Each structure stands twice: as C-alpha cells, then as structure tokens.
C-alpha cells in the first residue's frame, strides 16, 4: 500500500505582469489557468495542504516585475489568499536564495505541487531543483502557462513551449496532470505517477514508425 503524500502547493509568480503588463500569458489562457489556480488553492486549504505563495522581485529599473510597481503586485485573487508561507525570490527557482527547502523539511513535506507562471522558466527551474533534491513533484498543466519567444535560438509559440515542457517534465521530473485529476488525488490521499524517459521515447518512436 502506498503512503499518502505529504503535499505542499507552491503558487509561483501569479503577478499582474502576466495579466495586465507587457508579458501576458497566452497558453493556456489566463481565463483557464487563473480559475484553476484559485480552485487548487481553495482545495488545498480545505484538505490541510499548506499553500506557499511565491513572488518574483526585480530591481526598480527593470521593465518587468520592478519591486513596488503594479506589475510586481500579486494578482488580487492570490494576494488575498491566507497563505501558510510567503516567499520573495530574485532567481528562477523558488529554492534559490530562499528558505523554501528548510520550510518544507520543517513541515515534513515530501511532495511539491507546482502551479503558476511561467511553465518554462520559474516553474521549470523550481521543478528541476525540487526533483534533484529528492522531492516528488506534481505539475498542474492547466493551472500554469507561458508565452511565445523569438530570439537567435529560434522561435516558439506559447502552445509549443507549454506542450514540450509538460512532456519533458512528465518523462522524468514531475507528474503532469490536470487540476481536476489533482483534486481527486488530494481527496483520495493518493500519489500521482510520472512516466520515464525510456517509455516516453519508445512511444514516440513507435508513433513515428506508424
């Protein structure tokens, strides 16, 4: 019999920049992700799962997330939530330069559920950090989101970035599920399983061969 996970819900950078600033989240739409973020937070509170809210700080001269600016502020629906712990960070990973790891250890947490923004940046950095530290990780793919990029390395739509990172996460770093599937797992006290790199690759090879 599997042991019930000791979860914490990590809400990453749900800040106004992604809603009304110059870097709007495009996929999934915030009309999808924000309600799921709020739903997950409320469900966590009801189930006794600690909720940790993370906010990114940038220098006052920064064009995005300048500390004290409107774009830096948490979205009102997240700001008003009575979180169990709050973290301000200056790097991608919510672990880097913060007390997150110590807080999780002091509360006996073995499973970290990641929601918020952006899939490929702060979510990814945090997921990799958590997985390498030995935590079980969950990623709610409809309570997160991203935006498009174009640079010397190439171009990618928001949908492409979100889909590819979700696929990679599930292959080796985090169980990728919907908010509804996560709610069911929380109610039932069950762990969520990720795939592995071998099977993920073999399925793709078989699909290509067909």
What would you call each of these model-derived segments?
Residues 9-14:
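N-terminal nucleotide-binding beta1-loop-alpha1 segment
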Residues 17-20, 147-149:
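Short acidic/His/Gly/Ser-rich catalytic and metal-binding motifs that mark active-site loops
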Residues 23-30, 62-65, 154-155:
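Short glycine-enriched, charge-decorated loop/helix-capping segments at active-site entrances
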Residues 47-64:
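Short hydrophobic interaction/assembly module
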Residues 18-19, 52-57, 77-86:
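Short, basic/glycine-rich phosphate-binding loops at helix/coil junctions
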Residues 2-8, 35-42, 64-210:
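Active-site-adjacent betaalpha module
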Residues 5, 23-52:
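A short alpha/beta connector and helix-capping loop motif
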């Amino acid at each position: 019999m599997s042991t019930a996970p000791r979860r914490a819900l990590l809400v990453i950078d749900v800040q106004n920049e992604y809603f009304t600033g110059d870097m709007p989240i495009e996929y999934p739409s915030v009309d999808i992700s924000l309600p799921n973020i709020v739903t997950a937070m409320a469900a966590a509170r009801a189930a006794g799962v600690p909720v940790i809210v993370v906010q990114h700080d940038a220098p006052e001269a920064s064009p995005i997330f300048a500390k004290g600016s409107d774009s830096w502020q948490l979205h009102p629906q997240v700001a008003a939530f009575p979180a169990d712990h709050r973290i301000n960070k200056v790097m991608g990973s919510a672990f880097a330069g913060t007390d997150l790891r110590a807080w999780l250890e002091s509360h006996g947490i073995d499973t970290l559920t990641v929601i918020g923004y952006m899939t490929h940046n702060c979510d990814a950095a945090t997921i990799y950090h958590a997985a390498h530290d030995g935590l079980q990780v969950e990623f709610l793919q409809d309570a997160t989101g991203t935006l498009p990029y174009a640079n010397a390395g190439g171009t990618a739509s928001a949908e492409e970035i979100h889909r590819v990172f979700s696929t990679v996460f599930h292959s080796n770093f985090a169980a990728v599920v919907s908010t509804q599937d996560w709610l069911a797992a929380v109610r039932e006290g069950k762990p969520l399983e990720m795939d592995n790199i071998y099977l993920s690759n073999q399925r793709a090879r078989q699909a290509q061969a067909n």
